[in-house]
């Protein structure tokens, strides 16, 4: 893989900065803001995210003067700008004049004005005015010397269930299916006599309406995803009329269920996301989210658009980041592919729902606080680091298959248990690789599979057209596939495959799934391997038959004791494993550890528990990020005979590296081709 070019050649450095909302403050504070930003080495400010009313106090009146001053001041201070469109929160005048722009809740009831992302994505009025504002901003500022990126709207979110959406949904369905007969066939509406005889009879899946046709719910999710994406694209195209060479993005939200970020990433010039860990999150959870963002555009570095410099305000418990955690988490983002470290927000708001959200400058306005000191020290360190990490790629040999439509269909499915645990299962299969410092890409239904040696596809309930054939070809060509129970059950309309489970995967897996047993909490079974090792399993247990697959493990209890629970099928030059049950974590650690050894996939660096190591490779050098997530010192043995430059201290290291608690190191060594 070749390294990537800088996101914008006018800003070839790690983007350090964050959300800046000067419209909330008197002009007398602006110069002090800029002085303190320079002290922190802020290089990029995100401006204008929620400034619609400040820019357009009435439909016929625009007030850009204050923004002119802000951008000019930032440019004079040496700070670049990621300029946002303010469409995430419409003005009160807009909702009052055009009440049809307001979102409707899942019962179809129109919401009142307030909050944010409270618009109907199919509203022609909303679309017109949002695109108009984007065009005016681009026309006015496309040549501004501070401009380095466009930030469209903010954290696109939930579905709307209004009459406009219902009508647009019916049009969308006509385009998708062509005829009502075809829709009825694909939705299986003969069940419970729910056959539609006129398009006008189809409604959104209201909370107090139709909920028994899973294909309806699945299609409505697809439809709403497309409508919101159209809103993004309308603003993007409005910007591109005037600003063709500046990257355009929007900020995503981790594993957000309601939007298919793979489809969104195709329309973005760079992926950006907002990282807000909860108190329950472990470092591997954030690593997985970073890997998702890097993978959405097939390995392209991403932007960490927001993180709190300390606490949040919307979690059940808004824990302060302990000294050193902000720095460690920022470097973890860089380690997984980020090209920026940015905060929400610069100055804490005096009022509103986020007045207690963490910020670089607190209500006191002081710069002698713990948080400010940590932000300033990190900025100075990143300035010294320079551009060494930019464009670095992560050469992963392991792919973890994830699909939003599969998630939607699986979670909506009635049976065999209410708890499908898709994300929890994805995490469980990711964890053994993360703990071993083996890089992982998230892969998708349309990804290029040939670059991987091992592909893990848990709970692949819904199979998109052509995916089974591509997985079979991957195995035939020498790849190793691992999949699980609940895989290969339905097609894209949530119709069960007529020849049973695992549907089109049956040949490559060499098994047939007869039944699925759902075990209630507290009830378990055993997965017994052929060598006698035994592991607890439970939750869901598929009762399968081998059709050519080698049986590696069997159930140890209940009426299906002795039935296959783990199989391997050799096909062509590759192999496909089927795990019929949900095993304890110890099994996955053992299974993937042995599989990696067999395949010859090595960690980027051997480390003690609690120390994470990742690899980013530029055109000139390999960069090993080593992060001690523990509170105690840890020593890492370095590969024999190799010398590394530690970029944060300038030390030359051989044999060993000792890290204090929450400490970070970046070890650089030249590529052989660059020597």
Where would I find each of the regions flagged by the language model?
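Polysaccharide-binding and catalytic clefts of secreted carbohydrate-active enzymes
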Residues: 107-270, 274-288
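Short, well-ordered coil/turn segments that N-cap beta-strands
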Residues: 12-14, 41-43, 75-81, 143-148, ...
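Carbohydrate-binding surfaces of carbohydrate-active enzymes
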Residues: 199-202, 245, 254, 265, ...
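N-terminal carbohydrate-binding accessory modules
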Residues: 1-46, 57, 72-76, 80, ...
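Aromatic-lined substrate-binding rim segments of carbohydrate-active enzymes
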Residues: 32-38, 46-109, 235-242, 461
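The substrate-binding groove and active-site-proximal loops of carbohydrate-active enzymes
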Residues: 15-27, 50-65, 112-131, 153-160, ...
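Short, acidic/polar
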Residues: 25-39, 130-136, 253-264, 322-330
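Conserved, mostly hydrophobic/aromatic
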Residues: 18, 37, 45, 74, ...
């Amino acid at each position: 893989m070749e390294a990537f070019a800088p996101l914008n050649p006018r800003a070839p450095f790690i983007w350090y900065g964050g959300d800046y909302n000067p419209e909330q403050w008197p002009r007398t504070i602006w110069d002090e803001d800029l002085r303190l930003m320079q002290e922190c080495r802020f290089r990029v400010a995100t401006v204008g995210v929620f400034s619609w009313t400040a820019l357009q106090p009435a439909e016929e009146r625009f007030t850009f003067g204050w923004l002119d001053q802000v951008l000019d001041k930032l440019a004079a201070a040496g700070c670049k700008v990621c300029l946002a469109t303010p469409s995430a929160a419409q003005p009160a005048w807009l909702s009052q004049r055009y009440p049809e722009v307001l979102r409707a809740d899942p019962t179809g009831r129109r919401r009142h004005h307030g909050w944010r992302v409270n618009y109907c994505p199919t509203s022609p009025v909303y679309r017109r005015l949002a695109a108009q504002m984007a065009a005016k901003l681009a026309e006015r500022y496309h040549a501004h010397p501070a401009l380095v990126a466009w930030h469209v709207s903010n954290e696109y979110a939930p579905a709307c269930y209004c009459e406009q959406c219902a009508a647009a949904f019916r049009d969308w369905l006509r385009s998708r299916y062509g005829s009502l007969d075809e829709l009825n066939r694909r939705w299986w509406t003969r069940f419970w006599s729910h056959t539609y005889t006129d398009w006008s009879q189809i409604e959104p899946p209201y909370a107090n309406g139709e909920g028994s046709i899973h294909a309806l719910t699945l299609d409505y999710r697809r439809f709403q995803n497309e409508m919101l994406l159209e809103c993004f694209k309308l603003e993007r195209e409005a910007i591109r009329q005037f600003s063709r060479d500046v990257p355009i993005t929007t900020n995503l939200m981790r594993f957000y269920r309601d939007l298919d970020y793979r489809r969104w990433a195709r329309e973005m010039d760079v992926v950006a996301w907002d990282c807000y860990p909860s108190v329950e999150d472990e470092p591997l959870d954030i690593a997985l989210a970073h890997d998702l963002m890097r993978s959405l555009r097939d390995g392209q570095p991403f932007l960490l658009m927001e993180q709190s410099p300390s606490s949040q305000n919307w979690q059940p418990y808004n824990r302060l980041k302990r000294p050193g955690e902000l720095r460690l988490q920022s470097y973890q983002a860089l380690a997984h592919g980020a090209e920026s470290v940015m905060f929400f927000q610069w100055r804490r708001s005096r009022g509103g729902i986020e007045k207690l959200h963490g910020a670089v400058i607190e209500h006191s306005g002081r710069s002698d606080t713990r948080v400010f000191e940590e932000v300033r020290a990190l900025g100075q360190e990143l300035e010294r680091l320079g551009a060494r990490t930019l464009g670095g790629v992560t050469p992963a040999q392991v792919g973890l298959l994830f699909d939003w439509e599969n998630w939607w269909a699986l979670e909506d499915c009635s049976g065999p248990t209410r708890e499908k645990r898709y994300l929890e299962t994805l995490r469980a299969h990711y964890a053994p690789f993360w703990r071993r410092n083996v890089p992982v890409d998230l892969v998708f239904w349309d990804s290029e599979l040939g670059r991987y040696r091992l592909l893990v596809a848990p709970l692949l309930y819904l199979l998109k057209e052509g995916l089974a054939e591509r997985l079979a070809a991957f195995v035939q060509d020498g790849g190793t596939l691992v999949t699980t129970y609940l895989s290969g059950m339905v097609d894209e309309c949530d119709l069960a495959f007529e020849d049973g489970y695992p549907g089109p995967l049956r040949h490559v897996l060499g098994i047939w799934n007869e039944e699925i047993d759902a075990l209630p909490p507290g009830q378990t079974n055993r997965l017994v391997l052929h060598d006698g090792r035994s592991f607890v399993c439970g939750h869901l247990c598929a009762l399968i038959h081998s059709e050519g697959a080698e049986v590696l493990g069997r159930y140890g209890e209940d009426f299906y004791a002795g039935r296959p629970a783990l199989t391997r099928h050799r096909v062509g030059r590759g192999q496909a494993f089927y795990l019929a049950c949900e095993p304890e974590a110890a099994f996955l650690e053992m299974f993937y550890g042995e599989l990696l050894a067999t395949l010859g996939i090595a960690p980027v660096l051997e480390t003690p528990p609690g120390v994470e190591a990742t690899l980013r490779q530029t055109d000139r050098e390999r960069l090993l990020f080593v992060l001690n997530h523990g509170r105690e010192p840890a020593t890492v043995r370095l590969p024999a005979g190799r010398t590394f430059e530690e970029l944060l201290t300038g030390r030359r290291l051989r044999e060993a590296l000792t890290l204090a608690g929450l400490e970070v190191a970046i070890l650089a060594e030249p590529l052989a081709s660059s020597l």
